[in-house]
Amino acid sequence: IVFNPKSEISYLYLAKIFKEEENDGLEENNLNTVLLLNPKNEEAIYLLALLNIKNSNFSKVKQLINTLNTVCKKMCSSKLELQSKLESSLKSE
């Protein structure tokens, strides 16, 4: 990041590290940075949607699923998984 602050991959890896450490705030910050650098980064959209499901921010999840629908090339099956997790989270509320 020091040598190339526009490296979306570096921020994505940082987000994954913070996910493992269960630091939701820093995970979200880094995922948002990835999406600022590349709004079509499917993995960042997916991880941010999972984080928002965990935090019960369901309107944001729906928005992210719609975004994933429009940019999807490699992770198209992930949108079905997200939709399923969203539905089960909504039922448990």
Give the ranges of each region predicted by the language model:
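Canonical positions in the second alpha-helix
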Residues: 1, 33-34, 67-68
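Structural signature of tandem alpha-helical TPR/SEL1-like repeats
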Residues: 20-33, 55-64
